[in-house]
A protein has these predicted regions:
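Short, well-ordered coil loops that connect the C-terminus of an alpha-helix to the N-terminus
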Residues: 2-3, 33
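Acidic surface patches and DE-rich sequence motifs
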Residues: 8, 56, 70
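Solvent-exposed, acidic/flexible segments
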Residues: 13-20
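Surface-exposed, charged secondary-structure patches
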Residues: 20-60
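A short gly/proline-enriched turn/hairpin at secondary-structure junctions
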Residues: 3-13
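Short beta-strand edge/turn micro-motifs at domain boundaries
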Residues: 60-86
Length: 86
């Protein structure tokens, strides 16, 4: 099946859907979400992106999420989460 690139605080993995969901669930269980603000977003032809700041109980993170179009729907291609002082 399709894989997604996850880069969470410099730890990178190329994961299938189930592994990616587990990795994201573990991150969010350790970082209770307060809010998420979108800073930039865009779409062009077969791809798109969202960049924002995730505010959690354990600090703020810059989130980059990249999409690509597959059979007329957008799927997540890459998620990058990095600690930030923003």
């Amino acid at each position: 099946g399709d894989k997604v690139d996850l880069i969470i605080q410099n730890k990178s993995t190329h994961a299938d859907k189930r592994t990616a969901e587990g990795t994201m669930a573990a991150f969010f269980s350790n970082h209770k979400v307060g809010s998420f603000n979108v800073n930039h977003q865009g779409k062009r032809d077969e791809s798109g992106f969202v960049i924002g700041i995730l505010m959690t109980a354990n600090g703020n993170f810059r989130v980059n999420c990249f999409f690509r179009k597959v059979q007329n729907k957008y799927v997540i291609h890459q998620i990058r989460i990095d600690k930030t002082d923003e």
